[in-house]
Amino acid sequence: MATIPDPHLAMVRPVTPRTPEGCEECLMERSPWVHLRLCLTCGHVGCCDSSPLKHARQHAGSAGHPIVQSFQPGEDWRWCYVHEALV
């Protein structure tokens, strides 16, 4: 898939995953997740849109941090929730 230039990439920072063991909210709630996404602005680890609670998308909206990277082993892609596109 092609990537697009995205002005939100200016928000990307060097981050350390806050909860490398899983979705921050799901761990607290003891909820299941499917895949994980890493916020590239603050290091929040949230669950994907295929997960029941979609915490990565919720974080992007509430914190205003739209750029995430897959936090799955072997995957190397980034997504912008504002533009709904790979970046």
Language-model region placement:
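A detector for small-residue-rich transmembrane helices and their helix-helix packing motifs
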Residues: 2-3, 37
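Cys/His-rich, Zn2+-coordinating zinc-finger modules
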Residues: 3-22, 29, 46-87
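Canonical RING-type zinc finger of E3 ubiquitin-protein ligases
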Residues: 31-40
